[in-house]
Structure formats: structure tokens, C-alpha cells
């Protein structure tokens, strides 16, 4: 299922970029113009990430591109959409490990949190800047090549 999802979503990335290039989809919508209906559709698309091999960020960006949102704004919204889940999961982990947390050196924990947060900001900024001058086709090809590599590896019983 993972190999199929990687391949299929890769094809969708390529198809969407082809339709954009052919002017069948125009990327004019801005985040500030998002309607409640748009938000519901994006949320429904995000739920497809429950399927193994389907990227939550990727499926949200695909949905937003189909709806006509600009690439970089789709990426920003996709990453912002992940924040509540990441924060909730982090607090749940901290709660589950509260006994260890009491013994932990909070300085090291704080440094780790800060470095991870800073790295995430740098990565998101780089990705948004990348999308200002590039398409998502490279990610479509990446997913297709990875799916083919995994399929070959599975057939040869390497993995």
C-alpha cells in the first residue's frame, strides 16, 4: 500500500503541475480569501493522510492547488495546519514521560526544543522560497522513483 500511495500521489503531483502549466488551473487564490467551505475541503483532504504513504503536507498542498491557491501559500498553510497536532502530540509525550521529565535536565530539554524549532523554521522558509521559483514536480518524480526503488527492493527481497 505504501508503494502504491507513493507512486499514485507522485503522479497526482505531476498531473497537477501539468494542468497548471496548461492553464487549466490558475493559482490566484490567497489565504485571506479562504472560505469555510475551502477549509472543510482542505480538512477532508488532510484526512487522506491516514493512508500509509500519503503525505499530510503533500495532500493538503495538492488540494489547495486544485482549488487555485498559490504554491507558497499552500505550503505555509499546510505547515501551519500541522502545528496543533505537533503541539498536542508533544504535550501528550511530555505527560506520558512526566516521571522522566522530573529527573531530566531542563536546560538540555530546552536546548533541544529550541534547536528543533529553529531548524523547522529554517526548513519551512527554505521550502516556501523554493516554491516561489519551482514547481512541486520534483516531489512527484521523487515519490515515483522512491516507489519504483521500493518495489524493486521488495521483489528482490532486499527489504
For the regions a protein language model found, what residue spans apply to each?
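Multi-pass membrane proteins that catalyze or facilitate reactions on polyprenyl-/lipid-phosphate substrates
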Residues: 1-159
Amino acid at each position: 500500500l505504501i508503494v502504491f500511495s507513493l507512486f499514485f500521489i507522485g503522479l497526482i503531483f505531476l498531473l497537477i503541475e501539468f494542468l497548471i502549466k496548461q492553464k487549466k488551473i490558475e493559482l490566484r487564490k490567497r489565504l485571506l480569501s479562504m472560505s469555510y467551505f475551502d477549509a472543510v475541503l482542505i480538512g477532508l483532504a488532510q484526512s487522506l493522510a491516514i493512508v500509509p504513504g500519503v503525505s499530510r503536507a503533500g495532500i493538503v498542498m495538492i488540494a489547495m492547488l486544485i482549488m487555485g491557491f498559490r504554491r507558497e501559500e499552500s505550503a505555509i498553510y499546510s505547515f501551519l495546519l500541522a502545528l496543533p497536532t505537533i503541539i498536542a502530540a508533544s504535550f501528550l509525550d511530555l505527560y506520558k514521560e512526566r516521571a522522566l521529565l522530573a529527573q531530566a535536565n531542563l536546560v538540555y530539554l530546552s536546548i533541544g526544543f529550541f534547536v528543533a524549532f529553529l531548524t523547522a523554521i529554517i526548513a519551512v522558509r527554505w521550502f516556501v522560497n523554493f516554491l516561489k521559483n519551482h514547481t512541486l514536480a520534483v516531489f512527484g518524480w521523487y515519490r515515483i522513483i522512491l516507489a519504483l526503488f521500493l518495489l524493486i527492493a521488495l521483489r528482490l527481497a532486499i527489504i
